[in-house]
UniProtKB/Swiss-Prot annotation:
Subcellular location: Secreted
Record-given protein name: Venom nerve growth factor 1
InterPro entries xref list: Cystine-knot_cytokine (IPR029034), Nerve_growth_factor-like (IPR020408), Nerve_growth_factor-rel (IPR002072), Nerve_growth_factor_bsu (IPR020425), Nerve_growth_factor_CS (IPR019846), Venom_nerve_growth_factor (IPR020433)
Disulfide feature: C139-C204, C182-C232, C192-C234
Length: 243
């Protein structure tokens, strides 16, 4: 009797195990899901192949390719990169709009505390001018906001790619650089203005400094020191006397 019970129990268990599983409860990697993934992969591959053939037969215009490259280089930047003060420079500005121009639209307004103080001093001088004294610069300089700087030289002397547009919190910011350079290497025929040409040789030249800027390093955005024009100075050398 006991053998008959054992035989019936074993037959019942074998019958349960032999029932096929439903596709709705199919585990990951079962034929039901693998066939679906294989079908989607095949469709994706076929779509990419068709798109590639279409691009080869009808290549995109040059302007469109440049636009696509520009949008691809617009990498999303982590806002944490801007939280460290040591990366901030008064000569580097990230803005969605061009910086304001001055009234004459030839030089720009450098929004800095020191420059604000200088503007107040200049305003006082204009209010109370001194008629018996002339004030002239040794060299003539011009300052501009550079908006489309794509390449620069880093602190190691190597060329780097500068990010023009930065995607931050779904807003596109342009990276501006405030640069100052000489308007003319010889403001007067003898060189620098106000230098005694009988004893000195002089000329005006642009000097550089390094500022932190967002650059491209592979497919990542990184801070690097790059060289920009920052001042116009006078270089003098003593003339040799002929005996």
């Amino acid at each position: 009797m006991s053998m008959l019970c054992y035989t019936l129990i074993i037959a019942f268990l074998i019958g349960i195990w032999a029932v096929p599983k439903s596709e709705d409860n199919a585990p990951l990697g079962s034929p039901a899901t693998s066939d679906l993934s294989d079908t989607s992969c095949a469709q994706t591959h076929e779509g990419l192949k068709t798109s590639r053939n279409t691009d080869q037969r009808h290549p995109a215009p040059r302007s469109q390719r440049i636009k696509q490259f520009g949008s691809a280089s617009n990498i999303i930047v982590d806002p944490k990169l801007f939280q460290k003060r040591r990366f901030q420079s008064p000569r580097v500005l990230f803005s969605t709009q061009p910086p304001p121009l001055s009234r004459d639209e030839q030089s720009v307004e450098f929004l800095d505390n020191e420059d604000a103080l200088n503007r107040n001093i200049r305003a006082k001088r204009e209010t109370h001018p001194v008629h018996n004294r002339g004030e002239y610069s040794v060299c003539d300089s011009i300052s501009v906001w550079v908006a489309n700087k794509t390449t620069a030289t880093d602190i190691k002397g190597k060329p780097v790619t500068v990010m023009v547009d930065v995607n931050l919190n779904n807003h596109v910011y342009k990276q501006y650089f405030f640069e100052t350079k000489c308007r003319n290497p010889n403001p007067v025929p003898s060189g620098c203005r106000g230098i005694d040409s009988r004893h000195w040789n002089s000329y005006c030249t642009t000097t550089h400094t390094f500022v932190k800027a967002l650059t491209m390093e592979g497919n990542r955005a990184s801070w690097r020191f790059i060289r920009i024009d920052t001042a116009c100075v006078c270089v003098i050398s003593r003339k040799t006397e002929n005996f």
